Amino acid sequence: MEKKLLLVVDAQKDFVYGALRNEEAIKRLPNLCNRIRNWKGLILFTQDTHHENYLETQEGKNLNIPHCIEGTDGWEICDEVKEAYKEIYGDMTLPTILKKSFGYDGWAEAQLDKLGITEIEVDGFCTDICVISQVLVLKAMYPEIKIVVKEDCCAGLNEKKHQAALEIFNSCQVEVI
């Protein structure tokens, strides 16, 4: 029996409306919300999580735009995403993984293969940073689980970088739909 997981990466206010505001993310957010509403399977969310010392970190030195600082409004999952989840699951808390870097490093403990997961769809923001990091970590950890990315449910920092990430997915045997 097929068992699917939808991993929604960093659908946070700072990536859509805030510090790293992105018109493509604004445009594609309704697609992501519809995907959540219509998903038949498990759903997990990741939440990019930084602290006040962000600009002193390696990431902050390279992307010197403070964003997703824990406890701020920009750190929160977008209201539209929460509402889409709530329509299906009621007041159940969003199952969220707080991550301190581009990719979550706890997938080994999750034992997704032992849970019978046969396919993981990874969607969200930013395609060229956190989405690609999650995809490649998952592909390395679980080479026999099918990994899929829905192009119109993701957005990069810009369209050129988004397209470049999609090309890399294809090279790494990740299905882009």
Give residue spans per PLM region.
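Active-site acidic carboxylates
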Residues: M1-T96, T118, V148, Q163-S171, ...
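Short strand-loop junctions, especially beta-strand C-caps/beta-turns
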Residues: G18-L20, F125, D152
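Histidine-anchored nucleotide/phosphate-binding helix
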Residues: L32-I36, I132-Y142
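Alpha-helix C-cap/termination motif
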Residues: N38-W39, K114-L115, M141
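Short beta-alpha junction loops
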Residues: T49-H50, D152-G156
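Catalytic-loop motifs flanking and including active-site residues across diverse enzymes
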Residues: D73, I77, T127-Q134
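Conserved N-terminal glycine/acidic-rich loop preference
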Residues: I97-V131, A155-I177
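Short hydrophobic/aromatic-enriched beta-strand-loop microsegments
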Residues: P143-K150
